[in-house]
Amino acid sequence: GGTAPAITSNCFEYNFGINTITNAAWASGPSINTGRRGMQNTGIGSATAGLIVGGVTGPGPTVNKTEEYDGSSWTETGNYPTNLQNGQGAGIQTAAYVFGGSDGSSELSAGNTYDGSSWTSGTALPTATWIGCGAGTAPTAILAGGATPGSPTPSIATTLEHASGSWTAGGSLSTARRY
C-alpha cells in the first residue's frame, strides 16, 4: 500500500542475506487486496505472517479491512470494528493489539485485540492518539509519540505502556514525534 503518488496495492519483501554470497535486498511481493495508505501493521511478524489493518483508499473513505499475509498472498479476514487510519499496533498475526488512530473525521482512543480471525474490544487509550508508534507483543504494548486532538496537530513526547489490561504513563521522549 501507500502513495506513489497515487494509492497502490504494491507490497515489498526484504530478504535478509545471512552470508557474504547472498546480499540482503528488497523484492516485489504479492499485491494487497485493497490498495490504500495510512494502514496499521502490528510491528512484529515474519516472512510468512503479516497483518495490516484499515487505511484510506485514495480520495475515497477510511476503511476497516484486515488482511493477513501467509508468505505468498494476502487474504482479507475479519473486519476491524470501525473504519481506521494512522493507528498504532503491536503483536503478531494471531495475537495483535491495535489502538488509537482516526476514523477519518475524528481521533480515536479505542483499543482492540485480534486472535487470528476476529476483533474484540480491548482497553482504550486514556487520550485519543494517532500517528504514533506502537510496538510490543500483545497484550503488552507501548505507544510512543503521536498526536492528540487539536489544530494544528501537535506532536507529543510521552510513552504509554499497556500491560495487565491498563495503560500507564511511561517515560518521556526527548523530542516530540509523530508519524
Where are these regions (language model features)?
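Polar, enzyme-active/binding microenvironments
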Residues: 1-179
